[in-house]
């Protein structure tokens, strides 16, 4: 971070660590207090339409003393009350306090791009962007939340809000405001919901019509995310999604666009990088491109740092990749655009076609996505943690909620509003912010997400998935990148646990702390340790790494 600040008044205290991206002057310092309006704010994120909102507010007579987005939030709250959030385009977590009433308002953006954790404590409430910050002063219940444990081990490590693995720490759900009264009473309300309803005009549009409409929406989303007082770069994996973003940034006129790609050592014949495809795109658009190669030894040496940086345990193998990539990128860039969200929003995953016309979409979704069924979960954890099958109940409730009738769209909605929030987006925000790097995700522009929800599912499933997005991409990026086999962010050393990582996992699971916590059955752990590569989840993750990482994270942050 570039600077920090603290403000205390009566029973309330506020702290902030600032990354200077919009308005680099001291005028935009936080906590920001406006004595004239009797309001103060701490805010993490970026409001891309702040110039337009500023002009509206100036027309109402508001005077500004800074040029960034933070002050716009304060004035907007004063002008429009809590409904001001519906006018925001961006990613945000904020706390606004009213001097005279003593009331506090917490808010989190629609797609949960920015985190907001809170912990009720004796006589008060703590909140923070980082979960470990809540634990630093003690007094927080760090026992395990049984429902969260079931989610973590069953639902591909997705722990939906308000749960975290710690019983005393909650997270504000995306698209939610929490009002806190001076006497401590709390109330929440949702200000956004994703709806897959479409009118007759939407139904009648052709694939080609949707391609053009989508391309316009993509252009707007990428252009909005160029609003900054520092250069904006891009993470370029070599896949369709990040390549399309680079193409759109180049089309928007970004000069000397910096792009970055990370790769790892091959393991057991499995390729650890996709440099060749990123190079094709970098050459096509003349970017200032950097290949970042991480030797296996560095990966293993730096893994403890990545675990320490995690707000919650994140089992995806690419977490360490994003951590090391972010460190390298932060030497040259403060802001990057990144391609998370396209698979969830536009239907790129392999389970969506299986759901088309499904008679039992809940069962079919769980069969494809779940790491363990309930019987295996009962065999994994000790009896005191058995409880209910929280993840299956959660999926069923989500699929039965109004707003999505088609089985594919039920899955798209759940993946966009929950899985995406709690896995790829959380991972990227957490690991980039560890190095003061801001990642902006144009595929999660809420207007683009709403547009995508109107596109009929069969257009998304076309051409092997993401059909309408791929067709839009053909107008900008090379076919070789679009027609390649689907890739991912490969870190083979974590998929096939062996050597030092296996020993670290073994140590974590056999430690005194693990025995005292008593989460896992010894016979189950021994079975996994005997042959780690034989126990892989349907989504190709290591079951042993899930257990080991959870214990490692708890030992790092809780003890």
Q: PLM features: residue spans?
A:
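Cysteine-centered catalytic environments shared across enzyme families
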Residues: 1-310, 322, 474-475, 480, ...
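A mobile, often basic/glycine-rich helix-loop segment
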Residues: 346-369
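Short low-complexity, flexible loop/linker segments enriched in glycine and/or proline
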Residues: 304-308, 351-354, 496-498
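Active-site nucleotide-sugar/metal-binding loop of Leloir-type enzymes
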Residues: 328-330
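Short acidic/histidine-rich active-site segments
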Residues: 333-343, 347-349
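Adenosyl-5′-phosphate
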Residues: 10-11, 135-136, 141, 167-173, ...
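Conserved S/T- and glycine-rich ATP-binding loop of Class I adenylate-forming
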Residues: 236, 339, 420
């Amino acid at each position: 971070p570039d600077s920090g600040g603290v403000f205390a008044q009566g029973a309330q205290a506020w702290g902030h660590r600032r990354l200077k991206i919009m308005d680099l002057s001291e005028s935009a310092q936080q906590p920001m207090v406006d004595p004239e309006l009797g309001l103060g704010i701490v805010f993490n994120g970026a409001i891309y339409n702040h110039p337009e909102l500023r002009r509206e507010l100036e027309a109402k007579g508001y005077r500004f003393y800074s040029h960034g987005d933070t002050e716009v939030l304060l004035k907007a709250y004063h002008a429009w009350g809590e409904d001001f959030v519906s006018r925001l385009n961006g990613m945000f977590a904020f706390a606004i306090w009213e001097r005279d009433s003593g009331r506090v308002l917490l808010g989190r953006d629609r797609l949960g791009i920015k985190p907001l954790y809170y912990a009720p404590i004796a006589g008060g409430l703590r909140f923070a962007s980082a979960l470990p910050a809540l634990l630093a002063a003690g007094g927080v219940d760090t026992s395990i939340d049984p429902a969260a444990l079931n989610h973590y081990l069953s639902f591909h490590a997705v722990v939906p809000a308000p749960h975290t693995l710690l019983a005393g720490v909650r997270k504000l759900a995306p698209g939610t405001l929490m009002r806190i009264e001076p006497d401590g009473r709390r109330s929440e309300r949702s200000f956004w919901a994703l709806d897959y309803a479409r009118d007759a005009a939407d139904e009648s549009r052709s694939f080609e019509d949707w391609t053009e409409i989508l391309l316009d929406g993509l252009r707007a989303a990428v252009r909005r995310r160029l609003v900054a007082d520092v250069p904006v770069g891009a993470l370029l994996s070599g896949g369709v999604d990040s390549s399309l973003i680079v193409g759109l940034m180049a089309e928007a006129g970004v000069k000397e666009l910096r792009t970055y790609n990370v790769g790892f050592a091959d393991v057991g014949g499995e390729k650890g990088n996709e440099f060749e495809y990123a190079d094709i795109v970098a050459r096509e658009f003349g970017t200032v491109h950097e290949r970042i190669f991480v030797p296996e030894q560095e990966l293993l040496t730096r893994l403890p740092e990545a675990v320490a940086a995690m707000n919650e345990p994140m089992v995806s193998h690419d977490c360490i990749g994003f951590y090391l990539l972010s460190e390298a990128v932060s030497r040259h860039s403060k802001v990057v655009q990144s391609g998370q969200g396209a698979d969830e929003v536009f239907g790129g995953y392999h389970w969506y076609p299986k759901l088309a016309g499904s008679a039992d979409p809940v069962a079919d979704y769980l069969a494809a996505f779940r790491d363990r069924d309930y019987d295996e979960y009962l065999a994994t954890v000790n009896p005191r943690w058995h409880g209910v099958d929280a993840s299956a109940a959660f999926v069923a409730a989500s699929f039965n909620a109004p707003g999505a009738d088609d089985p594919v769209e039920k899955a798209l909605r759940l993946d966009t509003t929950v899985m995406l929030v709690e896995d790829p987006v959380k991972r990227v925000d957490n690991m980039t912010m560890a190095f003061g790097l801001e990642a902006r995700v144009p595929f999660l522009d809420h207007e683009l997400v709403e547009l995508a929800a109107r596109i009929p599912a069969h257009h998304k499933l076309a051409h092997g998935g993401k059909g309408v997005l791929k067709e839009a991409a053909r107008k900008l990026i090379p076919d070789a990148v679009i027609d390649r086999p689907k890739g991912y962010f490969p870190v083979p050393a974590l998929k096939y646990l062996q050597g030092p990582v296996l020993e670290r996992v073994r140590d974590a699971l056999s430690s005194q702390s693990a025995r005292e916590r008593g989460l896992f059955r010894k016979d189950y752990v021994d079975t996994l340790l005997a042959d780690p590569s034989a126990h892989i989840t349907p989504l190709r993750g290591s079951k042993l790494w899930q257990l080991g990482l959870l214990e490692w994270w708890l030992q790092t942050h809780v003890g």
